[in-house]
Amino acid sequence: MVEELPSVFLVGPMGAGKTTIGRLLAKQLGRTFVDSDWYVESQTGADIAWIFDKEGEAGFRERETRAIDELTQQPQIVLATGGGAVMAAENREFLKQRGIVIYLNAPVDVQMARTAKDKSRPLLQQPNPRKILQGLYSARDPLYRQVAHIIMPTGHTYPRHMVNQLLQQLNSFCASTSVVSEPEKD
């Protein structure tokens, strides 16, 4: 059943494990893994912190939307999106309509533990990162849930075990819906 899956898109807050789980899931599915943040960096030749510094968050979000539009049209990939990708209605539509969306739901304590020393996250370079993470979680959680086909809690199991659970959920999801492979493009 897994061979028939369309692309799989991972959403969730920073520190949820989208990149780690995405890589492992792609390997299990025999698919290409793409991280939308890395894609934006490769397209601009600059890191996200620089883009935020020079263009602000709005400039980065415009680039991110273009990237998500392009990436969600690629057949049978596993895509890890940036934590804020769901803020744009356009991105939510691309994700929901073009593949299976998995929300990796990490509590704020897990996010703090995983991002505490990461200086590459511009939104956390503030005096109170916990407050920032809590605010982001409160604002974004309903949007992650709105776009998700599958919700997977993170932070309490090993990544490989989580990927095995996701494969089971993907099989169940496909069996219970009319999900088929993406049509060939003309």
Curated annotation (Swiss-Prot):
Localisation: Cytoplasm
Catalytic activity, reaction form: shikimate + ATP = 3-phosphoshikimate + ADP + H(+)
Leading EC class: transferase
Primary localisation category: cytoplasm
Superkingdom of the organism of origin: Bacteria
Keyword entries, A-Z: Amino-acid biosynthesis, Aromatic amino acid biosynthesis, ATP-binding, Cytoplasm, Kinase, Magnesium, Metal-binding, Nucleotide-binding, Transferase
Name under which the protein is recorded: Shikimate kinase
Lineage: Bacteria, Pseudomonadati, Pseudomonadota, Gammaproteobacteria, Moraxellales
The gene coding this protein: aroK
